[in-house]
């Protein structure tokens, strides 16, 4: 399961717009910034700092995040958001990444599934 390029935030200008909106939500593993837009679908940007490890490890984290977002796709609202990985995420399994990411996305009201957990 992959995310099409139209679902990704790629340009620096777009990242800056999302960060300048100052709507941020965080848990121990991730920070999410969001921006309400008039897009027909959501767009996601990923940010993994060099402090988290070498390129292979950072790319693994981004792959896990993209896969988790692809699984969450039916539950995501039509907004732009950026996910920033915090230290400690490099040791998590895919299931732990999904759990932590779902938690922070629910806090930000980006993930909506109708369940109260």
UniProtKB/Swiss-Prot annotation:
Q: Which residues cross the membrane?
A: none
On whether Repeat is a keyword of this UniProt record, the answer is no
Matching Pfam families = Ribonuclease_P
Domain of life according to the entry: Bacteria
The GO terms describing molecular function are: 3'-tRNA processing endoribonuclease activity; ribonuclease P activity; tRNA binding
Checking Gene3D superfamilies in the record gives: 3.30.230.10
The Gene Ontology CC terms held by the record are: ribonuclease P complex
Top class in the EC scheme = hydrolase
Q: Spell out the reaction equation it catalyses.
A: Endonucleolytic cleavage of RNA, removing 5'-extranucleotides from tRNA precursor
Listed A to Z, the keywords are:
Endonuclease, Hydrolase, Nuclease, RNA-binding, tRNA processing
> Which GO terms are recorded in the biological process aspect for this UniProt protein?
tRNA 5'-leader removal
- Asked if Ribonucleoprotein is a keyword of the record, the answer is no
EC numbers for this chain: 3.1.26.5
- What does the subunit section of this Swiss-Prot or TrEMBL entry state? Consists of a catalytic RNA component (M1 or rnpB) and a protein subunit.
Instruction: Tell me the protein family, please.
Output: Belongs to the RnpA family.
- Tell me the function of this protein: RNaseP catalyzes the removal of the 5'-leader sequence from pre-tRNA to produce the mature 5'-terminus. It can also cleave other RNA substrates such as 4.5S RNA. The protein component plays an auxiliary but essential role in vivo by binding to the 5'-leader sequence and broadening the substrate specificity of the ribozyme.
What name goes with this protein?
A: Ribonuclease P protein component
What is the scientific name of the source organism? Lactococcus lactis subsp. cremoris (strain MG1363)
Q: Which gene encodes it?
A: rnpA
């Amino acid at each position: 399961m992959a995310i099409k390029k139209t679902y990704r935030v790629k340009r620096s200008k777009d990242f800056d717009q999302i960060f300048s909106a100052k709507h941020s939500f965080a848990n121990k593993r991730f920070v999410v910034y969001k921006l309400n837009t008039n897009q027909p679908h959501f767009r996601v940007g990923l940010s993994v700092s060099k402090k988290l490890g070498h390129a292979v490890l950072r790319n693994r984290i981004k792959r896990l995040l993209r896969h988790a977002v692809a699984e969450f796709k039916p539950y995501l609202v039509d907004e732009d958001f950026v996910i920033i990985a915090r230290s400690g995420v490099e040791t998590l399994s895919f299931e732990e990444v999904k759990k932590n990411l779902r938690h922070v996305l629910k806090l930000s009201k980006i993930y909506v599934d109708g369940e109260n957990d």
